[in-house]
C-alpha cells in the first residue's frame, strides 16, 4: 500500500468537518444544484421557525419545524463532508510533497572544482552539483558521475531504494529524494518552480477540479429530475387544497428533499475525486478527471513487449556461432560491439563475454561507436582495422547483402530456434562476415496471464507491439495470453495501429516513455507516460506513472471502469430510492383524505408527521452509509461486464427499492414515540 493511505487520520477528518460548514456558503453550494435546493428548503424552514405564520396558518409546532431544519442541515453537511474528505486526501499528499522540497541547500561545483553551498532555489539549469550519502537531492537532474542508491519514497511511495548511475535508463533524479549511499554528481535540469515536484503538487492540489463530460451529463439529468419533482410538489399543493388536505409548507419542503435525488447529488463529486485519488494511490498522476473517466471506456489496450509484458532487461544467455570454430571470434566481436553500449542488454553481453572468454578482453577500444536506433536496429563499433555490429536479423541480413557478403545457410535456423523459445536473436557480423547469434532471453512478468484474462472478461482487447520478428512475437504473445500482436513494430507504426483501432470506434490506451512515443501517446485516447521517460513523452500523455512501471496501465484502466460503474451503481440506487420513498410517503400523507390510498400504505407508518421525519432521517443517513462505497468504488474484479451489470442491478437497483421501505419503517417505529 502506498504512502497516501497514511492520510486516513483524525486530522483529515477534522479538516473535512470544518470544510463541510464552509461549503454551506450558497456560492459554494450552487455548484451542486440538488444540494442547493436542499439548502433553500432549509432556509425556508428557518424562516418558518422564526415567523410560523408567514405563509399562512401554521399547523406544525415550532419543535417539529426545528427538527426538520436540523435534519436538512445534517443532510447538507453529510454531502459536503463526503466531498471535503475526498478533496482532503489529495491536499494531504500535496503537503507531503511540499515538505520534501522545503529548506534544501545544494553543494554547487564551481568551474575550478571547488564546492560552494547555495540555496536550492538559486540553482540554474546546466549547473553541476554534488550530493552525498544522507543528503537530499535539491533539484531535478541527470547523473553525470558516480553511483548511489536513492530513496524515492517521498515521491513514489516505494520504500526500496533505487540505483542511480550515469548513462542508461537510470540516470534521472528527482528533487526531494534522498541519497542513501555513496555520492552523485548531477547536472541540474530544472529551476525553482519548474521542477517535477512543483508540477506534481500543482496536479495533485489543483485550484479547481473541472467536471468531466459524463459528470456534466449526469448532473444535467439529475437537475432535470429535481425540476420535475419540484413541479410535482408545486402542483400537489393546490390538489391537496382541493381535496381539503392540509399540507403545511414545511412538509412540502421535506417531501421535496425526500423525492429529489439527494443521495447521488451529495456523493457525485466525491465519486469523481475519489476516482482520481485511487489512481494516485497507484502512484499515477492524472492530469484531469476526464483522463481517469476515459479509462473506463477503454476497450483496446496497446502494450509494449519489453518492460510491460516482459521484464525490461533482456539478458544475454548464450552465444550461438554459425560453427564451433567461430565461437571465440563471436565472443570477442559481441564484446567489442557492446563495450560502449550502456543499455542493460549491452552490459549483459559484456558480462557474458567476460565469463566465457579465457583470455583478457580489451578494456578500451579506439574507434567510433554507432548506437542503436529504431531505424537501423543495430549497434557496433568501427575502428581502423575492423567494423563490428550486432542487431536484428532482418537488418543484419540486409546489410550483408547490400555489401555482397555471404549469408551462412544455418543463420536463419539459429534465429528461428531462439525466437521459438521466446528469446530475441541478435546477429553479430565482423567486416561483413556473419559470426553467429547472441541469444537475449526475455522473461514474462508473473501474473500477467491471469490479469489479461480478467481484462478479457471486462471486454478489453490486449494488443502487444514489439520490434521482434513474427515468430518471437507469436511465442511471447501465446505465453503471456495477449489477444493480438504486431511484430516488427517501430515507434511510428504505433500511431497507425492506434488510428486503425480508433477508426473502428475503439477507445485506445497505450504506454510510452521516449520522445519517439510522444506522437502515439498524444494520439491515443489514454496515454500513460513513465516518470523516467522524456519530457516530451510526459507532456504528450494524460497520465504519468511515478514508478515507471508500464504494467500500471492495466490497473488504471480497471480503476476507470470502477469509477464509471460506481457512479452508475449509486445513481441507480439513488433513483430507486426516490421511487421507493415516493410510494412510501405519499400514501401516508394522503390516506386520511383519500381512503383508497390506504391499500398503498404497505408500510403502515404511524402518522404523516412521523413518515416525513423518518424519510428525512433515512435520506441523511443513507448518504453517510454510501460514502465508503463512493470512496472505494464498487467491486469489479474477476467479473464480465454482463455479470457486473446484473450484480449492480440486483444490489443497487433492487436494493435501492427495498432498503428505503425497511429503513423508513424501522426509523418510524422509533420516531412515533417523539412526534
Curated annotation (Swiss-Prot):
Nucleotide-binding in keyword set: yes
Locations listed in the record: Cell membrane
Membrane topology of this protein: Multi-pass membrane protein
One CC-aspect GO term: plasma membrane
Residues passing through the membrane, by range: 34-54, 65-85, 216-236, 245-265, 569-591, 611-631, 644-664
GO molecular function: ATP binding; ATP hydrolysis activity; magnesium ion binding; P-type potassium transmembrane transporter activity
Subunit structure: The system is composed of three essential subunits: KdpA, KdpB and KdpC.
Protein name (record): Potassium-transporting ATPase ATP-binding subunit 2
Organism from which the protein derives: Staphylococcus aureus (strain MRSA252)
Amino acid at each position: 500500500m502506498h504512502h497516501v493511505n497514511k492520510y486516513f487520520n483524525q486530522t483529515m477528518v477534522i479538516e473535512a468537518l470544518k470544510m463541510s460548514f464552509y461549503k454551506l456558503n450558497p456560492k459554494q453550494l450552487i455548484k451542486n444544484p440538488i444540494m442547493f435546493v436542499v439548502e433553500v428548503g432549509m432556509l425556508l424552514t428557518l424562516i418558518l421557525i422564526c415567523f410560523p405564520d408567514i405563509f399562512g396558518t401554521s399547523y406544525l409546532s415550532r419543535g417539529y419545524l426545528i427538527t426538520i431544519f436540523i435534519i436538512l442541515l445534517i443532510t447538507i453537511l453529510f454531502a459536503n463532508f463526503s466531498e471535503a474528505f475526498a478533496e482532503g486526501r489529495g491536499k494531504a499528499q500535496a503537503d507531503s510533497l511540499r515538505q520534501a522540497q522545503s529548506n534544501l541547500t545544494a553543494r554547487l561545483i564551481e568551474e575550478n572544482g571547488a564546492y560552494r553551498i547555495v540555496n536550492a532555489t538559486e540553482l540554474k539549469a546546466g549547473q553541476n552539483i554534488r550530493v552525498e550519502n544522507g543528503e537530499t537531492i535539491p533539484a531535478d537532474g541527470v547523473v553525470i558521475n558516480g553511483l548511489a542508491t536513492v530513496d524515492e519514497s517521498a515521491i513514489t511511495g516505494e520504500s526500496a531504494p533505487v540505483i542511480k548511475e550515469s548513462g542508461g535508463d537510470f540516470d534521472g533524479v528527482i528533487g526531494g529524494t534522498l541519497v542513501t549511499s555513496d555520492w552523485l554528481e548531477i547536472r541540474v535540469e530544472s529551476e525553482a518552480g519548474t521542477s517535477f515536484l512543483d508540477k506534481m503538487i500543482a496536479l495533485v492540489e489543483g485550484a479547481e477540479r473541472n467536471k468531466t463530460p459524463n459528470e456534466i451529463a449526469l448532473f444535467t439529468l439529475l437537475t432535470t429530475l429535481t425540476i420535475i419533482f419540484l413541479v410535482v410538489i408545486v402542483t400537489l399543493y393546490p390538489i391537496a387544497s382541493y381535496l381539503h388536505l392540509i399540507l403545511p409548507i414545511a412538509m412540502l419542503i421535506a417531501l421535496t428533499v425526500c423525492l429529489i435525488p439527494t443521495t447521488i447529488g451529495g456523493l457525485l463529486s466525491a465519486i469523481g475525486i475519489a476516482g482520481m485519488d485511487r489512481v494516485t494511490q497507484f502512484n499515477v498522476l492524472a492530469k484531469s478527471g476526464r483522463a481517469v473517466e476515459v479509462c473506463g471506456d477503454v476497450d483496446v489496450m496497446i502494450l509494449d513487449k519489453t518492460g510491460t509484458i516482459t521484464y525490461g532487461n533482456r539478458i544475454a544467455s548464450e552465444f550461438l556461432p554459425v560453427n564451433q570454430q567461430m565461437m571465440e571470434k563471436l565472443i570477442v566481436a559481441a564484446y567489442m560491439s557492446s563495450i560502449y553500449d550502456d543499455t542493460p542488454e549491452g552490459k549483459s553481453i559484456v558480462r557474458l563475454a567476460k565469463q566465457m572468454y579465457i583470455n583478457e578482453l580489451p578494456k578500451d577500444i579506439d574507434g567510433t561507436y554507432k548506437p542503436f536506433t529504431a531505424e537501423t536496429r543495430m549497434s557496433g563499433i568501427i575502428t581502423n582495422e575492423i567494423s563490428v555490429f550486432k542487431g536484428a536479423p532482418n537488418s543484419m541480413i540486409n546489410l550483408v547483402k547490400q555489401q555482397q557478403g555471404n549469408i551462412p545457410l544455418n543463420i536463419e535456423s539459429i534465429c528461428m530456434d531462439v525466437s521459438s523459445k521466446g528469446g530475441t536473436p541478435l546477429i553479430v557480423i565482423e567486416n561483413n562476415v556473419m559470426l553467429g547469434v547472441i541469444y537475449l532471453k526475455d522473461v514474462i512478468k508473473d501474473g500477467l496471464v491471469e490479469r489479461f484474462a480478467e481484462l478479457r472478461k471486462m471486454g478489453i482487447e490486449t494488443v502487444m507491439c514489439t520490434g521482434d520478428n513474427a515468430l518471437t512475437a507469436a511465442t511471447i504473445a501465446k505465453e503471456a495470453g495477449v489477444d493480438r500482436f504486431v511484430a516488427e513494430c517501430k515507434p511510428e507504426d504505433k500511431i497507425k495501429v492506434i488510428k486503425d483501432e480508433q477508426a473502428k470506434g475503439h477507445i485506445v490506451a497505450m504506454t510510452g516513455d521516449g520522445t519517439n512515443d510522444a506522437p502515439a501517446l498524444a494520439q491515443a485516447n489514454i496515454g500513460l507516460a513513465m516518470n523516467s521517460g522524456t519530457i516530451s513523452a510526459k507532456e504528450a500523455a494524460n497520465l504519468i506513472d511515478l514508478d515507471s512501471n508500464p504494467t500500471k496501465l492495466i490497473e488504471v484502466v480497471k480503476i476507470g471502469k470502477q469509477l464509471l460503474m460506481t457512479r452508475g451503481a449509486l445513481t441507480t440506487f439513488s433513483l430507486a430510492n426516490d421511487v421507493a420513498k415516493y410510494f412510501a410517503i405519499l400514501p401516508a400523507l394522503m390516506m386520511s383524505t383519500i381512503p383508497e390510498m390506504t391499500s398503498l400504505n404497505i408500510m403502515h407508518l404511524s402518522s404523516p408527521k412521523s413518515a416525513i421525519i423518518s424519510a428525512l432521517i433515512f435520506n441523511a443517513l443513507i448518504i453517510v452509509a454510501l460514502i465508503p462505497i463512493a470512496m472505494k468504488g464498487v467491486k469489479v474484479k474477476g467479473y464480465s461486464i454482463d455479470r457486473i451489470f446484473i450484480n449492480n442491478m440486483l444490489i443497487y437497483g433492487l436494493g435501492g427499492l427495498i432498503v428505503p421501505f425497511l429503513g423508513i419503517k424501522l426509523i418510524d417505529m422509533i420516531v412515533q414515540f417523539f412526534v
